[in-house]
C-alpha cells in the first residue's frame, strides 16, 4: 500500500467537495439533463485549486459541449467562487446517419466569453477519435475560434476578418 501525497489528498478533497456542492445544489446553480453524467476534474496549478465539471453523454454518437462549470477553492478547500462556463448544453452527432453526407464541421456561439475555452478544447480532444468532423468553430461578437481536431491546432480570427473572408468566398462562387 502506498500513502497518498499531500497534493493527491488535496485533489481528492476538492473533488469530493465539488461533488457535494453539485448534488446539494442549494441555489439551483447547476443544471442536470437526461442521459448525461457529470465529470469532475480537479486541478492544482500554481497553488490554485480548481475543479472543472464537464457534462458527458450517456448516449452513443453524441458529443456534449456546455453545461460546464469551474469551482475555485482556497487553501483550506473551501469554495470561493463558482462559474458557469456555458449557459446551455449543446449536443452534436459524432457521425452522420447518411454516409453520403458526412459531418465536416460543427460550431457553437459564445456569449459569456470571446474565444473557445478550455472545456471546449478538452471535450473536443476527448472525442476526436470518435467523430467524423475535423473542425469546430466557436463564434462570438468579437472573434471566431477554429479548432482543428486532427492537427490539434487552434486559430483565432477577429470577427471582422472572418466576415471579410466570408464575403470574399461568396463573391468567388
Protein language model regions, located:
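Active-site-proximal loop/helix of nucleotide/amide-processing enzymes and allied scaffolds
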Residues: 1-13, 17-20, 28-46, 91-173
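Short helix-loop boundary/capping segments
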Residues: 57-60, 66-94
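Exposed beta-strand-loop-beta-strand "reactive/processing" segments of non-cytosolic proteins
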Residues: 28-71
Amino acid at each position: 500500500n502506498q500513502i497518498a501525497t499531500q497534493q493527491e489528498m488535496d485533489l481528492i478533497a476538492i473533488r469530493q467537495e465539488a461533488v457535494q456542492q453539485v448534488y446539494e445544489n442549494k441555489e439551483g446553480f447547476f443544471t442536470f439533463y437526461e442521459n448525461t453524467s457529470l465529470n469532475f476534474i480537479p486541478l492544482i496549478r500554481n497553488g490554485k485549486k480548481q475543479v472543472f465539471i464537464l457534462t458527458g453523454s450517456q448516449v452513443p454518437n453524441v458529443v456534449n459541449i456546455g453545461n460546464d462549470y469551474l469551482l475555485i477553492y482556497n487553501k483550506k478547500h473551501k469554495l470561493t467562487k463558482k462559474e458557469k462556463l456555458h449557459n446551455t448544453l449543446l449536443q452534436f452527432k459524432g457521425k452522420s446517419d447518411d454516409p453520403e453526407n458526412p459531418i465536416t464541421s460543427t460550431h457553437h456561439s459564445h456569449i459569456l466569453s470571446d474565444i473557445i475555452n478550455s472545456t471546449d478544447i478538452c471535450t473536443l480532444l476527448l472525442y476526436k477519435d470518435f467523430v467524423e468532423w475535423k473542425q469546430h468553430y466557436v463564434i462570438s461578437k468579437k472573434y471566431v475560434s477554429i479548432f482543428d481536431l486532427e492537427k490539434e491546432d487552434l486559430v483565432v480570427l477577429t470577427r471582422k476578418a472572418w466576415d471579410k473572408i466570408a464575403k470574399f468566398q461568396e463573391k468567388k462562387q
